[in-house]
Amino acid sequence: MLPVPRASRRRSRLALIASAIVASAALVLTGCSAGAPAGQSSTGGDTGAFPVTVKSALGSTTIDAKPKRIVTWGWGAQDIVLALGIIPVAMPKFTYSGTADGVLPWDAERITELGGKTPQLLTFDTGEVPFEEVVAAKPDVILAPYSGLTQTEFDTLSKVAPVVAYPEKPWSTSWRDQTAIVGKALGMTKQTDALVKKTEDSVSTLAAKYPVLKGKTFYYAAANEPGKLNVYRADDPRVQLLNDLGLKNSPSVAALDSSKGDGSFFYQLSYEKLSQIDTDLLVMYFDKQSSVDAFTSDPLVAAMPAVKEGRLAAIVGESLVMATSAPSVLSIPWSLDRYVPVLAAAAEKVK
């Protein structure tokens, strides 16, 4: 099951370690070398862009000089940094969908292309920021534009290095905005603009090969809990990627949303309300085929028109699920050729 990013954190622990972090950070940064670590590429870009200020929902961050030691947190930021030809000094460890070492496949391929080594991997499964591990990485900047950082975490990390958080809500930054934010923070806006354009072109080209998708409605959900669906709202990046491919959000997504305004990127729907879903495609992710079979064997699920008529687009496999759940300029090209045919096969069944 794809881990759902956690909005809540254990705040008491922060209070206990905050002062220790400040002291440790001061010692670490005082002794920090200005050179990039072995295996890390030069950031290049426009050194004249600094100082630069990046605004976020948690506060403005000023970066005085071009960062050389980059730490990423959350989803996607490490993809963007790697796509720019830079290997972060530390990034999250992904036990779901990652390699044996905890590196996402497209990141592992890119690190190999760059001739580098796997960076320090940060404990990520708990959803809590591993502050001591971040301090040990000696960052010049911490990039977390697609994350669930709390205000307390942001403030604590800001004592270690400048922190770049999300512009509006946690876990809701589009892949385009993530890329632009990272580009600004690193003084590489020309490069990130080019990455966005290249990615948009690849999406448009593939969408044109599957005109059956254009204008079809979809309802994106996940069966992460017994008897309930997690339904992804319009501002979720995985939903926006389907919009890029020409699909339209089903009116059912908003019509069945009884918890609007709660600040989350998804809401829960009971199986008792499945019959109220009206959509061309039902798009869902699963870790393996047996999970698909278990889901569709439920009588309430089996009775859904989209399931009965083969209009369920089941995205199967942890790596493909992660790549399309956290789309980026690196994961989108890696996944599209596997993703779009599944969507098109379901769209062909629409009468």
Where do the model's predicted regions map?
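Sec-dependent bacterial lipoprotein signal peptides
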Residues: 1-30
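Bacterial lipoprotein signal-peptidase II cleavage site
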Residues: 28-48
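Short helix-initiation/N-cap motifs at beta->coil->alpha
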Residues: 58, 122-130, 261-270
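Extracytoplasmic substrate-binding proteins
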Residues: 60, 152-226, 325-351
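A short, structured surface patch at a secondary-structure boundary
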Residues: 78-131
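Proline-aspartate-enriched helix->loop->beta-strand connector
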Residues: 131, 138-144, 162, 274, ...
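Alpha-helical, coiled-coil/dimerization segments enriched in small aliphatic residues
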Residues: 232-265
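Structured C-terminal subdomain patch of bacterial secreted/periplasmic proteins
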Residues: 278-351
